[in-house]
Structures are given as C-alpha cells and as structure tokens.
C-alpha cells in the first residue's frame, strides 16, 4: 500500500510540475509576471530571462519603466549590481502617501552574473501602478550578453496584435480594482 501511495504521489508531482517546467523554455523572450494586475496598487513584477543570446551568457538586463509609474523599487540580487536611472517630470505629481515627486525611475539595470544560456533567472521590481484600468503598460527590456544583445522592445500599434511582433516588450494589463 505504501508503494502504491508513493508512486501515486510521485506521478501527481510530475504531472503538476510539468506545465511549470514547460512554461519557461517555451518562452522565447524576456517576460513579466503578472500579466494582469489591479490599477492603483502596489505589485511585485517578476521579469524572467529564459536563455542567453544565441548561446551566450546574459551579463545585464535593462528594464525601461512606462509613464505613469511614480514609485519603483528594484530587487537586490547577489552577484549582480543594480543601477537605477531617473528622469525629471515636466510637472511634479502626487505619489503614494501624499508625497510630491518631480523625478521618477526611468530604467532599472542589473549587471553581473553571468547567467549561463542553459539556465534562467528572475529579476524583480516593486511598482505602484497608476489608477488607469484597461491600460496596457509596456516594459521594454534589453538583454546584454557576453556576445550580443537581445532587444525585447517592440510595442504594438493600435491596430496591430502583439502576436505579430518579433521581439515584443513585456506587458502588464491593468484592470479595475475589485470592490
């Protein structure tokens, strides 16, 4: 009985893990999770780098933040240096907790590693999304490698589907907050 139970648990574990294992290699580009999030909320974005550049190890990942994000804090990663570039706003805006800001995070870069081509890793940024439900926020990503660069920066035009893009930028769709 114990052997049957152990075999059943092993089979269930493999079946549950298989979709997760297949999800990362199937992605051919830098992606972001979640794909959808509530507007006007804090959220941890997780960017996944599933491979290097044509077999070459990843040495840097740069993420450009879209307009409307007034608060952003990158994840510290052992073995990687974090760089934050800011930009001035034309007009100061009220950020979370009533604070007025005239400068926001424009780009976050992690440099170091290297991350071998046959492994994946994730990089996080906690952001405060704007109160703009039904808006898609694009996060253009540039992946620098020992030999070469991959630019995941394409943003679809109004009448173009994202599935038509060769190197799509990671995207999060904002939805209305639940009551």
Task: List each language-model region with its residue ranges.
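Sec/Tat signal peptide C-region and signal peptidase I cleavage site
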Residues: 22-28
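Low-complexity, intrinsically disordered segments enriched in Ser/Thr together with acidic residues
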Residues: 108-135
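Short, surface-exposed ligand- or partner-binding patches at beta-edge/loop junctions that are enriched
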Residues: 134-143
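Short beta-strand segments of immunoglobulin-like
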Residues: 32-38
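Extracytoplasmic/periplasmic copper-protein system
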Residues: 144-179
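Bacterial N-terminal signal peptides
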Residues: 8-21
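Extracellular adhesion/glycan-binding regions together with long Ser/Thr-
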Residues: 88-117
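Low-complexity, serine/threonine/proline/glycine-rich extracellular segments that form mucin-like
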Residues: 43-80
